Amino acid sequence: VALVSGQSASALIVDRLGLGPHGRQPVTLQRVLAALIGVSAVVVAVSGRLDSAEIPIWLVALCFVAGIGVSVQQAINGRVRDVSGEPLVAAWLNFVVGASILILVFGVMVLVGTVAPRALPSGPLWLYFGGVVGVIFIATTSWVVGKVGVLRLSLLAISGQLVGSLVLDLVVNGYLDAPLILGVILAFMAVIVNTIQPKKPDALTGLE
């Protein structure tokens, strides 16, 4: 929830500043409402799965900051795609930088004895399919963000994640969770609210 909150709030600002290839978009009541509905969708979806364990405030804050970074990353990926003309370039850059940092951190942890290296594969082979999914996701979003903007992309991603959770629950666990179903409905409502074209601008920032 903290991550989605940070992502939605940041998406409004990123679009307002025009960091993404879709250009500058005003902060309107309609867009703010769409972002709030999107966050509410996640809150409702996970409401039946939260336990009573207290989560440290620093961890919540870290997730919020990570959400902010997601929106900025999506905007930058879109710019990279525009400059290069190839969505896979953005995906390649992300994974080169990410892999380099992970290798560096892992090397330090091995040297100080925090972790011990293990032979690969160290888990089920299907886990490694996540890397392929990541490449497809980043390549796709780097292209889509230029068409719809960062906020709408974020709302679409939230909707897709909740639908994916719904399908996995049905296929793997054999049941449907009522809060998750309601969360999916709210997520698509957020997309619809953000997509509807207002008759006149209601900008809160003075940007037409």
Name the predicted role of every residue range.
Residues 12-68, 184-208:
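Juxtamembrane helix-loop boundary signature in multi-pass membrane transporters
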Residues 65-73, 111-151, 192-193:
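Hydrophobic alpha-helical transmembrane segments of multi-pass membrane transport proteins
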Residues 1-9, 54-69, 118-134, 179-186:
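Structural signature of hydrophobic alpha-helical transmembrane segments
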Residues 34-37, 61-62, 81-130, 160:
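Hydrophobic alpha-helical transmembrane segments of multi-pass integral membrane proteins
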Residues 8-30, 162-180:
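C-terminal transmembrane-helix exit sites in multi-pass transporters
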Residues 43-57, 109-123, 166-178:
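Membrane-interface helix termini and inter-helical loops of multi-pass transporters
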Residues 1-9, 88-97, 135-169:
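Helix-helix packing/entry segments at the starts of transmembrane helices
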Residues 10-25, 72-84, 136-148, 192-200:
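C-terminal ends of transmembrane helices
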